[in-house]
Amino acid sequence: MAPTSTPQTPFGRVLTAMVTPFTADGALDLDGAQRLAAHLVDAGNDGLIINGTTGESPTTSDAEKADLVRAVVEAVGDRAHVVAGVGTNNTQHSIELARAAERVGAHGLLLVTPYYNKPPQEGLYLHFTAIADAAGLPVMLYDIPGRSGVPINTETLVRLAEHPRIVANKDAKGDLGRASWAIARSGLAWYSGDDMLNLPLLAVGAVGFVSVVGHVVTPELRAMVDAHVAGDVQKALEIHQKLLPVFTGMFRTQGVMTTKGALALQGLPAGPLRAPMVGLTPEETEQLKIDLAAGGVQL
């Protein structure tokens, strides 16, 4: 059974978009994935996103995706929400991935906006609702036009929110004004998908965040959202400002590269990256050490 959720926080408040650990020869490291998932939940995560962008989903097979979700559910599914990334730019393929994720025990689905083919808003609506219809799991949309090439407009979000299983949105649009209107009008549970904007989005109505830096600072993120919910705005701001070097450092290059580099520095499961992604250079690793130390991360 998944942890308790509410309509306001269907996936909890603090989630980390987990990397996919690989062995030295590039194979899926299921044991490492289970150990990393347990570490992240022990640190304070309410949920984990599996097979997202940070999970190198473009380079894993459908079978690997299912195996990874199954392994993480076995490891932490009784105490954390396991949300499977199943979004592609092919609606039928996404439906197949959604059904597979449901079969292996996922608690929810993350659906990224179709990328490259740039469908119109009606196409986005049909795509998302078809997937939500095909599986019996709650859905978190993922609006990231910088990668997908097309935004989910507010009117479309309002329509999508009428679907009983579309309950949340991960916002990586970087537009607080649009977010403010969309939160107010759609009623969707709003999750920040941009670590630098975690606190600003909480201020305009977000309920939590899907984080990359949660791999290294989950306790601090937990403390920040708890302070905000308790009305201690000053404490939340102090934590946000303390973490600024981490937010900056973890995104000097692609987030999965710095995340796996940071995990390696901490002796946690990560492994190499699959092409076309590559590991950090020695110079990038040294800069990452400086950034993490400036944010109080112990290595």
From Swiss-Prot:
Give the PANTHER family listed for this entry. Answer: 4-HYDROXY-2-OXOGLUTARATE ALDOLASE, MITOCHONDRIAL, DIHYDRODIPICOLINATE SYNTHASE
Question: What's its job?
Answer: Catalyzes the condensation of (S)-aspartate-beta-semialdehyde [(S)-ASA] and pyruvate to 4-hydroxy-tetrahydrodipicolinate (HTPA).
Subunit field text: Homotetramer; dimer of dimers.
| Entry-linked PROSITE patterns | DHDPS_1, DHDPS_2
Q: Which gene encodes it?
A: dapA2
The protein's superkingdom reads Bacteria
Name where it mostly resides. Answer: cytoplasm
Q: Which reaction does it catalyse?
A: L-aspartate 4-semialdehyde + pyruvate = (2S,4S)-4-hydroxy-2,3,4,5-tetrahydrodipicolinate + H2O + H(+)
Q: Which GO terms describe its biological process?
A: diaminopimelate biosynthetic process; lysine biosynthetic process via diaminopimelate
What name goes with this protein? 4-hydroxy-tetrahydrodipicolinate synthase 2
The species is Streptomyces coelicolor (strain ATCC BAA-471 / A3(2) / M145)
